[in-house]
Each structure stands twice: as C-alpha cells, then as structure tokens.
Amino acid sequence: MDINEIREYLPHRYPFLLVDRVTELDVEAKRVRAYKNVTINEPFFNGHFPQHPIMPGVLIIEAMAQAAGLLGFKMMGVKPSDGTLYYFVGSDKLRFRQPVRPGDQLVLEADFLSNKRGIWKFDCRATVDGRPVCSAEIICAEQEI
C-alpha cells in the first residue's frame, strides 16, 4: 500500500500522517506491517530536542495507532469517506525501550486482538533495525461521523 492508498484509509495529513508505506496487510491473519521514515525535516525536531533530536514518544504511539487504524478500516471494508472513523482512546501495557532518531526507519506492526461493541484492541510494536522501540495494546473506538 503506497502513500496514495494510505491517504484513502487514514484521515490524517501533514504533519500528522505518520505512516509512509504498508509492506504487509493481511485481513485474514488480522495483521499489518508498515513503516515511517524519520527525517531531520520532521517539524517536531525543532523543539524535541534541537541539540539531541528524538521522536516524541506520543508520536510513536500515534504512528502505531495509525497502522492499527489501517488494519481496522481494511478489516471492516470501509474508508473515512464512508462516514466511519477510529479514534485513539487508550493504551495498555505501554513500554518505551529506546529513542527514535533522525535517519531511523520506524517499523510498525499491529495484530488485531478484539472488537467488542465498537471498541477495537490491537497488539502493537515499533522497532528500528529489528530492535524494540515501543510496544502497547492500542485501543480505538469506532465512530460514525
């Protein structure tokens, strides 16, 4: 899935679209693998931190949630243009393991865990060069708009 198709399934736009490409999306296996190329040109590096730039943890979480959202949209067979959005509403078991720096490729993986009455749960991981960066269970709420 290239950036044009990603933009069909995610309502986010610059500077908040945090998925560059999907390399695997398997609806039957209920999993997605994607990545974000992190460059020094990201607007958040101006203030976080100019002399020692690292990607804010909340944006790593958001990137994982966006990957999970892509999986959710594909599993349901809908797009935001159909009148449905998935809102990030929480996380469980959140852990950060190492910082993400300019030049890193942030690999995002999400596996579907459950959907109960429109509350979706995904097991998400972010890695750089195969090393764990962040992991969490991401919780999203399905909402018609």
Swiss-Prot record:
Its main location: cytoplasm. GO terms for cellular component: cytoplasm; membrane. NCBIfam families: fabZ, PRK00006.1. Belongs to the thioester dehydratase family. FabZ subfamily. It comes from Stutzerimonas stutzeri (strain A1501). It catalyses: a (3R)-hydroxyacyl-[ACP] = a (2E)-enoyl-[ACP] + H2O. GO terms for molecular function: (3R)-hydroxyacyl-[acyl-carrier-protein] dehydratase activity. Pfam families: FabA. Its EC number is 4.2.1.59. It is found in: Cytoplasm. This is 3-hydroxyacyl-[acyl-carrier-protein] dehydratase FabZ. The active site is at 48. It comes from the Bacteria. One of its GO terms (biological process) is lipid A biosynthetic process. Involved in unsaturated fatty acids biosynthesis. Catalyzes the dehydration of short chain beta-hydroxyacyl-ACPs and long chain saturated and unsaturated beta-hydroxyacyl-ACPs. Keywords: Cytoplasm, Lipid A biosynthesis, Lipid biosynthesis, Lipid metabolism, Lyase.
